[in-house]
Swiss-Prot record:
Belongs to the SRP19 family. Keywords: Cytoplasm, Nucleus, Ribonucleoprotein, RNA-binding, Signal recognition particle. The gene is SRP19. Component of a signal recognition particle complex that consists of a 7SL RNA molecule of 300 nucleotides and six protein subunits: SRP72, SRP68, SRP54, SRP19, SRP14 and SRP9. Interacts with IPO5, IPO7, IPO8, KPNB1 and TNPO1. Interactions with IPO8 and TNPO1 may be involved in SRP19 import into the nucleus. It is found in: Cytoplasm; Nucleus, Nucleolus; Nucleus, Nucleoplasm. The lineage of its organism: Eukaryota, Metazoa, Chordata, Craniata, Vertebrata. The keyword RNA-binding applies. This is Signal recognition particle 19 kDa protein. Component of the signal recognition particle (SRP) complex, a ribonucleoprotein complex that mediates the cotranslational targeting of secretory and membrane proteins to the endoplasmic reticulum (ER). Binds directly to 7SL RNA. Mediates binding of SRP54 to the SRP complex. Coiled coil: none annotated. Gene3D superfamilies: Signal recognition particle, SRP19-like subunit. Its main location: cytoplasm. Residues 117-144 are annotated as: Disordered.
Length: 144
């Protein structure tokens, strides 16, 4: 334990890890979600988390080949984790607005829906849903 205290908070090994499952509203707490479902985001990616954290001024880097241990789906979409620096060399906070890992997760979940990639996807998806609803009129019960 003594050698763990000797390492600097600025080492990349000491950065906090954020997996997309922590912010996913499709996951239960048992499956790895760490924030309230009301604040969680639908299927966030590690790249989106990195973009949001980098935009606010945090020191981040993306590890694309890492996977969350509770994630059963092995698709490329679900891979990746983001490492975020919370503390500087002297132990003080990098940004005062992020005193804990939970504050970073809540901020990322709040900002991801505002990304341009998210707003463009939802705008096009609504039209396809409206067109598909008209074809369901012909279905009825089976006759015996």
């Amino acid at each position: 334990m003594a050698c763990a205290a000797a390492r600097s908070p600025a080492d990349q090994d000491r950065f906090i890890c954020i997996y997309p499952a922590y912010l996913n509203n499709k996951k239960t707490i048992a499956e790895g979600r760490r924030i309230p479902i009301s604040k969680a985001v639908e299927n966030p990616t590690a790249t989106e988390i990195q973009d949001v954290c980098a935009a606010v001024g945090l020191n981040v880097f993306l590890e694309k080949n890492k996977m969350y241990s509770r994630e059963w789906n092995r698709d490329l979409q679900y891979r990746g984790r983001v490492r975020v620096q919370l503390k500087q060399e002297d132990g003080s906070l990098c940004l005062v607005q992020f005193p804990s890992r939970k504050s970073v997760m809540l901020y990322a979940a709040e900002m991801i829906p505002k990304l341009k990639t998210r707003t463009q996807k939802t705008g096009g998806g609504d039209q396809s849903l409206q067109q598909g609803e008209g074809s369901k009129k012909g279905k009825g019960k089976k006759k015996k």
